[in-house]
Amino acid sequence: MRLDKLLTELGTGSRSEVKKYIRSGLVTVNGEVVKKPEQKVDEKNDTVCFRGNQLTYTEYEYYLFHKPAGCVTATEDNLHRTVMDYLTDTARHDFFPVGRLDIDTEGLLLITNDGALAHDLLSPAKHVSKVYYAKIDGRVTEEDVNLFENGVDIGEEKPTKPALLEVLHSGDNSEIRLTITEGRFHQIGRAHV
């Protein structure tokens, strides 16, 4: 990998800033000052330092993030704060959230730069379960549980795949845990229990 590309990926600066740092002698590779941004380095075996601090390259990184209500599950948005706006400890720009939670929904999200893992987690063919906890208005009954076991009509051509609805508390305000293996647009909110 080119030295300037490596430093950019590690969040040292923009490509043009990194080139200036390298040409200024602020970067060493295996203890030697390097002034050519295009120099090839082995990111796994070479020791690269910037201003005397050793840099460590990891191809993939993973963050578990508790998304608060009020922010959107997106990499950028002109109207709302995004989950990416909370990642202050990284300057890498290749991260993305895996899956979606509605703006008013809070919950655990995986944020990564590992596209293959994201595909495996989101692909309907892989049948990876997603678990939701929800507080809802109204009483949840055994009939509702059976409805989810058979798939729910959410106003699309096909009903949802079967899901596991667990009633944690049933009353005027109920609490449920719902386990699904697909993720359709607003699926949880559109499944009127």
Where in this protein do the model-derived segments appear?
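Basic, flexible Lys/Arg- and Gly-enriched helix-loop patches that mediate nucleic-acid binding at interfaces
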Residues: 1-192
